[in-house]
């Protein structure tokens, strides 16, 4: 992290449901002493800053304020949540053109100020927008990445924990590829405290392993659609994912997280942004981790990359 960076300062661009929930989660985390909220609707940003600030007597001292792009120059992390929200029955990829247009107004503002912090993309479709952000900012790839399938992987762990009646924190499993309809469960590497998932299922008395696993995979994939159908938007889960990623950066944890970044020679995939586990620390992505995948998973990953590549080819960036 650069000397010109305040390692205890974070900026959140976009104060809709996801941005404000992320800001609240970051306030509670104790990771930062300063937070700037930016939104095209300045009144909304000011209102969120005030509302969250009123909870500070129950947390830790910090400065929270609405601001503009000049206020983010020394931020250690710039979280970008701004964008149109996903509507019922709308896929994340349906949001592409609307949110690319929004990013064309946001990312150049960050770039022209020579910000040296980490750019964490959260807006959807996160894989496409992360690649757009890399191109528009000109920043090194390690400093620009997306929340990716961090939330999807948490959903997978939660559902597996419920199914197997075990603490979700003991479940180690990844969702990889697109944060969207072509995402893949890396079942071949999934385990519960070192015990392969299929063996653990048998140990818990579940014999219809394939059937249950397919049901859980679909449950993860449909989670967002189900929530949006019921309450119009998802925001608490992703806010916790944002907090977790920021924690790994600020504490230089070198944690392995399934974030979205441009892939290089990942099972033959080159130059496409999607989620794979990566080591995350104070300088962003330190190294991509190539986990073992079986042939079926490798083919599904290539198919996911192909779908994203097709969308990218149609964009004017």
Model-predicted regions and their roles:
Residues 91-157:
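Rossmann-like NAD(P)(H) cofactor-binding subdomain of soluble oxidoreductases
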Residues 34, 38-76, 90, 309-317:
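Conserved N-terminal Rossmann-fold NAD(P) cofactor-binding segment
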Residues 28-34, 138-140:
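Conserved S-adenosyl-L-methionine
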